[in-house]
Amino acid sequence: MRINKFIANKGICSRRKADELIKEGKVKVNGKLVIELGLDVNEKDNVEIDGIESLESQNLVYFMLNKPKGYICSSSDEKGRKTVLDLVKTKERIYPVGRLDYDSEGLIILTNDGDLAFKLTHPKMQVSKTYVVKIKGQIKESELAVLRAGVKIGDVKYNKCKVKVIATDKNWTKLSIVLFEGKNREIRNMLDFIGKEVILLKRVAISELKLGGLSRGEFRPLKDFEIEYLKNI
């Protein structure tokens, strides 16, 4: 088994985060520093991670959180800012799946299931994420067409997305935006590219899993059928 999957299966972090820990020189196998991301290990190997006292397997848990503004999607923050883990109380060691930036809000899944985290975040899986975005002013059909076609900003290519106007006023416009990838600050950067200022950015669904009536800052365990649905996307 590849070492990143081994670590993820123990509920430590996602496969992607495990790769980061290896690159940072924080993982040892049988006393030797791991330098190969694709290293194969098994249960007989002694795997150590800096700062983690035990790699005993945990019960898998799954939570939905309505993240408020002012929290970061990380297990810790070197700047001392509040993280989403401050809002979800559980004895299991969990981590957020994907991210919402500091000033955004809405649906975040937290779990210790590394395989599910991998499935929901890997670009090749094309799992849709739906957002409600409120911007200042109006938006032209030609500008919507630019967003739908995808844009390149510097060296970063943002792929096609689904965009439609769902409400409008003389001072603002509310959009529904569906993404199929998860680049950092993707929506904000695309809207800035066409000269639009974001007032509100809220994720309301991951594939067909919807935030529903969960209040800001509240969380709940995912129901069995929701977990099965996500695993079978």
Report each predicted region and the residues it spans.
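Basic, flexible Lys/Arg- and Gly-enriched helix-loop patches that mediate nucleic-acid binding at interfaces
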Residues: 1-233
